[in-house]
Curated annotation (Swiss-Prot):
This is Alpha-dioxygenase PIOX. It comes from Oryza sativa subsp. japonica (Rice). GO terms for molecular function: heme binding; metal ion binding; oxidoreductase activity, acting on single donors with incorporation of molecular oxygen, incorporation of two atoms of oxygen; peroxidase activity. The gene is PIOX. The keyword Cell wall biogenesis/degradation does not apply. Hexadecanoate binds at H311, E599. It catalyses: a 1,2-saturated fatty acid + O2 = a (2R)-2-hydroperoxy fatty acid; (9Z,12Z)-octadecadienoate + O2 = (2R,9Z,12Z)-2-hydroperoxyoctadecadienoate; hexadecanoate + O2 = (2R)-2-hydroperoxyhexadecanoate; (9Z,12Z,15Z)-octadecatrienoate + O2 = (R)-2-hydroperoxy-(9Z,12Z,15Z)-octadecatrienoate.
């Protein structure tokens, strides 16, 4: 297809990439581009919206999956010898034993943009103070609660953490904002840069967590950690009599990933320890002769699949609350034929009709599986956390609004790290979960970043506290620059999205425009990614920006279809019949909570999803 013929129809900034596409890719691009120019795809009937999303995903899979580092194609193995998830993530991809394992490179969704000369431009302290720091708290209404905020942090503890360098660097707040900063300066470890020893991208960063959706926030990322969490009886994990995580003498929780956590993540880790142990009991009842190791492996597979399913068809559906996205996310799991057909007849057809889960073989689209730098960047969602938690009484009588009575307000800053574990032990699971369920989380917008994160005690890998506090808001701005993630406008171009020409294209908020202009001038190319994601006009029903959503489109599907335990090995032979039935009958977090705390759901959860505020009538 001649590029010249269609040149007037393509945005000038996207003509170069368009000209290099194949004939059929150009057709697909023109289709989505027509909707993008009119901001239409989310306003059209569901079938057309699904066609748009599938076309966009297909293009992103072709142009926005970049390998970093050499692929270990020589490390072949027999998948039948590894019908279980290894602790460090190895031996999942039959053609690349190392793919997705601990201490392998983050991939890329776009070529890196070196910003070593612009690490402090504009100053991260200024950006954090003038554009991110919370002023008047904004929440998400009934759509999304604090459990939903904790859930995505629970997932991040499963997916990704960058290896740090041993040395430290420091940054100091300029005089213009120093008096408004909780910390006037702070020290931190830079991200460790490693040579990739390959063509293409020369420098990369290691992910010290396993990139697979393998429940490593519960199980750990290596054998050393996993061994400390097991009872070695009937496949079970250690858990306190109170249903909370156990702790070492120094107060550090015993769980898969405990670094830089808070009480909200801890209760989800504890809940899924109970889920794992319940799966062990159920499978043992059907197979009484299984060993401890066999029960553990089966239960880990089942529990990891439950977590992935909850995220796919429950959490994401509430995050992106539109009819089209509900259909799209359910299609990822069940296919367009739907749950009844799939549960009755199994996987039929390809990924569209039958879904990504249960495909005959995994598909990594020719690029070794990993999570990416850009994926990390769009998951910077600390503004979801409110400043205070209204503690509610699960044993009390409903108040005038038919809600559990409030006991007190707790500063969520006191629920972070080791202090948070102490608080949680006094509060208990039921009270904590109920309180988080009944309270809306923060909105992902400008001026909504919690103040306690700007004076935060970071932790070492073993969960112990470091001596130097950090300003997390300023550090997050710095991290994207340090890791060569393109700034907002270029980020959009690389995703085939129409870039902004002025601040008015970004937002209609006059105060935001004035403040952004004061910091970045009129140069829209300087806008930091995090600021753009928070400032961007949102699609109705979306709790996140459309720009971030495009990374979701690509990577949410990839986490399922590249993993053989969600594709070729998603079967009774690998999971057991009871295990498969367990996954099939779990449709959301509500089901998991109901399994272990039925009195909470029966008395207090009126919403259909545990991620909506629990008194919501939907």
């Amino acid at each position: 297809m001649g590029s010249g013929l269609f040149k007037p129809r393509v945005h000038p900034d996207l003509r170069d990439v368009f000209s290099k596409m194949s004939f059929f890719d150009k057709i697909g691009f023109l289709f989505i581009h027509a909707f993008d120019k009119r901001n239409l795809w989310h306003k059209v009937p569901v079938p057309i919206g699904l066609l748009y999303l599938n076309t966009r995903r297909t293009l992103l899979e072709k142009y926005n999956l970049l390998a970093v580092g050499r692929s270990s194609h020589g490390a072949l193995f027999d998948p039948k010898e590894f019908l279980y998830r290894t602790e460090d993530g190895k031996y999942n991809d039959p053609h690349n034993a190392e793919a997705g394992s601990q201490n392998t490179f983050f991939g890329r969704n776009m070529e890196p943009v070196d910003q070593q000369d612009e690490l402090m431009s504009p100053d991260p302290f200024v950006v954090a103070t003038k554009l991110l720091a919370r002023r008047e708290y904004k929440d998400t209404g009934k759509q999304f609660n604090i459990l939903a905020a904790a859930w995505i942090q629970f997932m991040v503890h499963d997916w990704m953490d960058h290896m740090e360098d041993t040395g430290q660097i420091g940054i100091t707040a300029p005089k213009e904002v120093a008096n408004e900063c909780p910390l006037k300066s702070f020290k931190f470890h830079p991200t460790k840069e490693l040579p990739t020893n390959s063509d293409g991208i020369k420098i990369g960063h290691y992910n010290i967590r396993t990139a697979w959706w393998d429940g490593s926030a519960v199980y750990g990322n290596n054998e050393e950690r996993a061994e400390k969490l097991r009872t070695y009886v009937d496949g079970k994990l250690v858990i306190g009599d109170d249903g909370l995580l156990l702790h070492k003498e120094n107060g550090v929780a015993l769980s898969g990933d405990i670094r830089n956590s808070w009480a909200g993540v801890s209760i989800l880790q504890a809940l899924f320890v109970k889920e794992h142990n319940a799966v062990c009991d159920a499978i043992k009842e059907e197979h009484p002769n299984l060993s401890d190791e066999e029960l553990y492996r089966y239960a880990k597979l089942v529990t990891s699949a439950v977590i992935a399913k909850v995220h796919t068809i429950d959490w994401t559906v509430e995050l992106l609350k539109t009819k089209t996205m509900r259909a799209a996310m359910r299609a990822n799991w069940y296919g367009l034929l739907g749950k009844k057909i799939k549960d009755t007849f199994g996987h039929i057809g390809g990924p569209i009709l039958g879904g990504l889960v249960g495909l005959k073989k995994p598909n990594n689209h020719g690029v070794p599986y990993s999570l990416t730098e850009e994926f990390t960047s769009v998951y910077r969602m600390h503004s979801l956390i409110p400043s205070t938690l209204k503690l509610r009484d699960p044993t009390g009588q409903p108040d005038a609004n038919n809600s559990p009575p409030c006991l007190e307000d707790i500063d969520i800053g006191e629920m972070i790290g080791l202090k948070g574990e102490e608080q949680l032990s006094k509060i208990g699971f039921e009270k904590q979960a109920l309180s988080m369920g009944y309270q809306a989380c923060g909105a992902l917008e400008l001026w909504n970043y919690p103040s306690f994160f700007r004076n935060l005690i970071p932790q070492n890998l073993d969960g112990t506290n470091r001596s130097d506090r950090i300003d997390l808001a300023a550090l997050e701005v710095y991290r994207d620059r340090e890791r060569s993630v393109p700034r907002y406008n270029e980020f959009r171009r690389r995703l085939f999205l129409i870039p902004i020409k002025s601040w008015e294209d970004l937002t209609s908020d006059k105060d935001a425009i004035e403040t952004i202009r004061a910091i970045y001038g009129d140069d829209v190319e300087k806008l930091d990614l995090l600021v753009g994601l928070m400032a961007e006009k949102k699609i109705k029903g979306f709790a996140i920006s459309e720009t971030a959503f495009n990374i979701f489109i690509l990577m949410a599907s990839r986490r399922l279809e590249a993993d053989r335990f969600f594709t070729s090995n998603f079967n009774e032979e690998t999971y057991t019949k009871k295990g498969m039935q367990w996954v099939k009958t779990t449709e959301g977090l509500r089901d998991v909570i109901n399994r272990h705390y039925p009195e909470i759901t029966a008395k207090w959860m009126k919403s259909s999803s545990a991620f909506s505020v629990w008194d919501a009538d939907y």
